[in-house]
C-alpha cells in the first residue's frame, strides 16, 4: 500500500521564523503532517480527575492512512479530536505542518476545521434534506457562491458514486450510501486531513469493504492524510499503513501494520488481535500435555512468520528441517502491505531430533516459534 506524493495546501497561520525554530528543535517535524508532543488530557468529574491521555508522542506522516486502536476507554476518541481541537489538551502540543494549533484564536480554528474533514459512525445527515443539499450545506454556510457550490457538489457526488442519488433523502439510502454522503460532505472544503471515527462500525462486512475501497481511492487520488479509529482490527489490516495501540491513555505499541499485526509485542496488542489469529483446534487442545505420554507422541509447534518475502515462507525448507512426519493442523499465510504474514500450528511426529533441537531448527526459519506441548 503506497500513499501518493500529491499534497493539499498546508495549513499555515504562523510566521516562518517560528516554524524554523520548531523544525530545529524537532527535525522530524519536517516530515510529519500531524505531530503530538507530550500530549495529555485530563477530565474533571464529581469523583475527581480522570486522565484520558498521557505522554502521547506521535507523528503522522503526509499522505498516510494511520490507524488508532485500543480497548474501550483507551483514549482513542480523545486523541483524534485534539487534531481539530474539538478536544482541548490539558498539556502538551499538537502541531500541523509544524504549526502549534494550541495558539490559534477562534478565527484560525474555524479555518483549521475547514481544512480537516471528519466522518462518524452514525452519518449525522439531515433527514429533511436530500443528498445534494446535505453535501452542499457546509458550502452554503461558508458563503460560497451558488455556481461554485454546484460544481463542487457534482464533483464530490461523482467521486463517491452517488451522482444518480442526488435527489434521494437519507431514509431512502442504505447505510453504505449514507456514509458516502458523509464522506462527500467531509470533503467539500478540500481538506488536507480526514478523520474517521468508527466510520464503518455500523456497516455490514460487504459495505465496509466498499467504504474502505473508497477511502483508499480518496487517499491515493487526493493525497489526503487519513487518521482513523476503529474497534475492527480487520479494517486496520486492510487499509492502514501504520498503527498505534493505546491502553489507559498511553501508547503501548506502534509501527507498520504488517509488523504489529504479524508479531505483536504488548499483551494489549495480542488481545486485540486475537480474533484474527488461528488457534489450536479444540480436539487437539483437550489432548495436550507437557510431556509425551507415548514414544510416538507428536510435538506441537506454534510458528509465526512476519514480513518475509512476497512469495511467502519456505514451508518445504521448514518441514525438511524438522524431519519426521509434519502435519499442518491450523493456520495460513496472508499478505499485509505486500509482506507475507504466517501463523502455523504444526504437529511433528517421529522426528530424530529432540524437543530443544526441533525448536532451534524452527527458529532458524521463522522469527517466532514456541512449543505448545505433546499429543499422545
UniProtKB/Swiss-Prot annotation:
Subunit note: The complex is composed of two ATP-binding proteins (MetN), two transmembrane proteins (MetI) and a solute-binding protein (MetQ).
Organism: Pseudomonas syringae pv. syringae (strain B728a)
SMART domains for the chain: AAA, NIL
Binding-site list for ATP: 70-77
CDD domains xref list: ABC_MetN_methionine_transporter (cd03258)
Subcellular location: Cell inner membrane
Record region (Disordered): 1-25
Principal subcellular localization: membrane
GO molecular function per UniProt: ABC-type D-methionine transporter activity; ATP binding; ATP hydrolysis activity
Domain ABC transporter positions: 34-273
Gene Ontology terms: cellular component: plasma membrane
Family label: Belongs to the ABC transporter superfamily. Methionine importer (TC 3.A.1.24) family.
Phosphoprotein recorded as keyword: no
Keywords in alphabetical order: Amino-acid transport, ATP-binding, Cell inner membrane, Cell membrane, Membrane, Nucleotide-binding, Translocase, Transport
Protein name (Swiss-Prot/TrEMBL): Methionine import ATP-binding protein MetN 2
EC number, as in UniProt: 7.4.2.11
Function according to Swiss-Prot or TrEMBL: Part of the ABC transporter complex MetNIQ involved in methionine import. Responsible for energy coupling to the transport system.
Catalytic activities: L-methionine(out) + ATP + H2O = L-methionine(in) + ADP + phosphate + H(+); D-methionine(out) + ATP + H2O = D-methionine(in) + ADP + phosphate + H(+)
UniProt membrane topology term: Peripheral membrane protein
Pfam families (UniProt xref): ABC_tran, NIL
Amino acid at each position: 500500500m503506497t500513499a501518493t506524493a500529491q499534497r493539499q495546501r498546508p495549513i499555515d497561520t504562523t510566521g516562518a521564523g517560528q516554524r524554523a525554530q520548531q523544525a530545529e528543535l524537532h527535525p522530524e517535524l519536517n516530515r510529519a503532517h500531524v505531530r503530538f508532543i507530550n500530549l495529555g488530557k485530563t477530565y474533571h468529574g464529581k469523583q475527581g480527575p480522570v486522565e484520558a491521555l498521557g505522554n502521547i508522542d506521535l507523528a503522522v506522516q503526509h499522505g498516510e492512512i494511520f490507524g488508532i486502536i485500543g480497548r474501550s476507554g483507551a483514549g482513542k476518541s480523545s486523541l483524534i479530536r485534539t487534531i481539530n481541537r474539538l478536544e482541548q489538551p490539558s498539556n502538551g502540543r499538537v502541531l500541523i505542518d509544524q504549526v502549534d494549533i494550541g495558539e490559534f484564536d477562534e478565527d484560525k480554528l474555524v479555518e483549521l476545521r475547514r481544512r480537516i474533514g471528519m466522518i462518524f459512525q452514525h452519518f449525522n445527515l439531515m433527514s429533511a434534506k436530500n443528498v445534494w443539499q446535505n453535501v452542499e450545506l457546509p458550502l452554503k454556510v461558508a458563503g460560497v457562491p451558488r455556481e461554485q457550490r454546484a460544481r463542487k457538489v457534482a464533483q464530490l457526488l461523482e467521486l463517491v458514486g452517488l451522482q444518480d442519488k442526488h435527489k434521494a433523502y437519507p431514509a431512502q439510502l442504505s447505510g453504505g450510501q449514507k456514509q458516502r454522503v458523509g464522506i462527500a460532505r467531509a470533503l467539500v472544503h478540500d481538506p488536507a486531513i480526514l478523520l474517521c471515527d468508527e466510520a464503518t462500525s455500523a456497516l455490514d462486512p460487504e459495505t465496509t469493504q466498499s467504504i474502505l475501497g473508497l477511502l483508499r481511492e480518496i487517499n491515493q487520488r487526493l493525497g489526503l492524510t487519513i487518521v482513523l479509529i476503529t474497534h475492527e482490527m480487520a479494517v486496520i489490516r486492510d487499509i492502514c499503513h501504520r498503527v498505534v495501540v493505546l491502553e489507559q491513555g498511553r501508547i503501548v505499541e506502534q509501527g507498520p501494520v504488517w509488523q504489529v499485526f504479524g508479531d505483536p509485542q504488548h499483551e494489549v496488542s495480542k488481545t486485540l488481535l486475537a480474533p484474527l489469529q488461528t488457534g489450536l483446534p479444540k480436539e487437539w487442545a483437550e489432548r495436550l500435555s507437557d510431556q509425551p505420554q507415548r514414544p510416538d507422541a507428536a510435538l506441537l509447534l506454534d510458528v509465526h512468520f512476519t514480513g518475509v518475502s512476497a512469495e511467502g515462507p519456505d514451508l518445504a525448507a521448514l518441514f525438511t528441517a524438522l524431519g519426521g512426519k509434519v502435519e499442518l493442523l491450523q493456520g495460513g499465510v496472508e499478505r499485509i502491505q505486500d509482506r507475507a504474514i504466517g501463523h502455523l500450528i504444526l504437529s511433528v511426529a517421529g522426528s530424530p531430533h529432540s524437543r530443544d533441537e526441533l525448536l532451534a531448527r524452527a527458529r532458524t526459519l521463522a522469527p517466532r516459534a514456541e512449543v505448545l506441548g505433546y499429543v499422545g
